[in-house]
Every structure is written in C-alpha cells, then in structure tokens.
C-alpha cells in the first residue's frame, strides 16, 4: 500500500480552509499541520487534531513533511514559497503566483534552481469539459479560432473586503479572479503576443481595481477580450456557469465565447 503524502497548509483563510477539508477526506494524503496565527487556526488545530505552527520556520524544523500548500495573501507568496523550495519541499501555490512580475520570476527561478516541483492552483484547466475542449482545439476539430470573448462579472458583497489584503496592492479581482480566466484562455489558445489593458476603481474607490478590460493578440493571430468587474450583478462568470461551487447559483449563461472558421 502506497504511503500517504504528508501535506501542511500555510494560511488558513478562505482557500486554506478548502484545502484542509479536501485533504482530511483524501485517501492519498495526510494533513500534517497548519501554519497561521489566527484564532481560527487554533480552532482548526483542535478540530483536526494536528500541529499548529505560528511561522514557516517552525514548520521547516518539523519532521515527516512531504509537501506544502501555500494559501497566504498574494503579497506573501514569494517569501513563503521560496522558503520551502530552498529546502526542496514541493509546493502547491494558490493563484496568482505573486503580486508582481519580479517576484513571480524569483519563485520560478527558485523552483528551477532547486529542481523542486511547483504547481500554481489553476484548477479549472483540469475540469473535464475544459480538457475536452482543449483536445478538440488541438486536433483541429473545431476549425481555426479567430477570436474569443470572456466575461467575469460577479458582484461581491462589502463584507468580502473585510480582509484588508484584498484591497491592498496585490489584491483586487484581477489577481484574485481573472487570473483563472487568463490562465484558461491561454491554455486553450496558446501564448500571448500582445497585451493592452485598462482598469478603474471608480465604483469601490479602493487602492485596487474593481473593473478592467483586457485585449490580447495570440501568437496564432487569434484575438481575445476579457471584461471583468466585481461590482456588477450579472449571470456571466465561470463561477455561475461551471457548477463547481454549490454556494453559487447556476445560470446556464455562457461566459466564454469562441468564434471559429473552417478553411
């Protein structure tokens, strides 16, 4: 019988909690420990009967650790992730990889230098429907893709922003939500050649954007527009069409549109 993988969760916020629940039910993984300083983390430690560490260094000094999931605020991704990569501990890092390009490059560089697995949490590309669409595109069964349009309009209640990192540099719906859509459209259409983008914080007045539009040109010549806002009540977003999360109603309205031609 294969040994279970001992995984620690760094950060017990919204996504960290989801990982904790998933691992606790897994037949292939074991919940090794959690790292956080919140009162909620103390309660989770008692509930799941696992060690609680107050910082990454304490975890690194523990025994029998096989891998970690980093689910801390975006601004802390580099600091936490590189600490594990240097010790050659595989990391599943919640998206986005970081809050800026230089930091992202350092994380990737550390993974390559230490020859240690690093996976970013873009789970949507593993959806069976997305995988099938990818297969059909790659085999040319859908013809040539000329353009694509992606909508990500999902209203967020003001309580969502009680977490201050979400309204600080490195937060905002671009890094929290639209990164999923950008990853998936690139997964389907390939590498990007040109980018043009506009953002505004006109509605919420936070230090981060609440609305954005992005225009892309892919190496294939295909064009794409992505339209994002977390201030609009609307039926068009992946969350409302995929049915992955029971917390969201299913609208059956397409948030992704591909235009194709057969030559």
Residue ranges and their predicted role:
Residues 124-207, 212-216, 223, 236-238:
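Predominantly a Rossmann-like dinucleotide-binding segment in NAD(P)-dependent oxidoreductases
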Residues 62, 67-74, 78-125, 140:
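Beta-strand-loop-alpha-helix segment that lines the small-molecule cofactor/substrate pocket
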Residues 1-48:
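N-terminal Rossmann-like dinucleotide-binding module
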Residues 261-263:
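Conserved small/polar residues in nucleotide/adenosyl-binding loops
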Residues 54, 93, 120, 196-199:
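Short loop/edge segments at beta-strand edges and connector loops
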Residues 233-247:
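Short, surface-exposed loop/helix-turn segments at secondary-structure junctions
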Residues 33, 67, 147:
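Short, Asp-centered acidic motifs that coordinate Mg2+ and/or phosphate
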Residues 50-56:
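Conserved SAM-binding strand-loop segment of SAM-dependent methyltransferases
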């Amino acid at each position: 019988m294969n040994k279970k993988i001992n995984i620690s969760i760094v950060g017990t916020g919204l996504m960290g909690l989801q990982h904790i629940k998933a691992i606790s039910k897994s037949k292939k993984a074991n919940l090794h420990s959690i790292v956080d300083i919140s009162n909620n983390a103390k309660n989770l430690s008692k509930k799941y009967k696992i060690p609680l560490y107050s910082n990454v260094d304490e975890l690194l000094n523990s025994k029998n650790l096989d891998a970690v999931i980093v689910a801390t605020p975006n601004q802390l991704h580099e600091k936490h992730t590189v600490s594990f990569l240097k010790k050659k501990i595989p990391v599943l890092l919640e998206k986005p990889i970081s809050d800026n390009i230089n930091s992202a490059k350092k994380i990737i560089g550390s993974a390559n230098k230490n020859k240690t697995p690093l996976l970013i949490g873009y789970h949507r590309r593993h959806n069976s429907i997305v995988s099938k669409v990818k297969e059909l595109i790659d085999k040319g069964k859908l013809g040539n893709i000329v353009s694509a349009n992606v909508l990500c309009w999902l209203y967020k209640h003001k309580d969502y922003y009680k977490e201050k990192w979400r309204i600080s540099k490195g937060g905002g719906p671009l890094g929290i939500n639209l990164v999923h859509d950008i990853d998936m459209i690139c997964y389907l259409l390939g590498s990007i050649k040109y980018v043009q983008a506009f953002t505004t914080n006109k509605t919420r007045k936070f230090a981060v954007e609440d609305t954005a539009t992005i225009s892309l040109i892919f190496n294939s010549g295909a064009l794409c527009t992505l339209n994002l806002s977390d201030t609009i009540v609307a039926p068009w977003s992946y969350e409302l069409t995929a049915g992955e999360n029971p917390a969201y109603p299913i609208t059956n309205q397409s948030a992704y549109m591909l235009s194709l031609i057969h030559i």
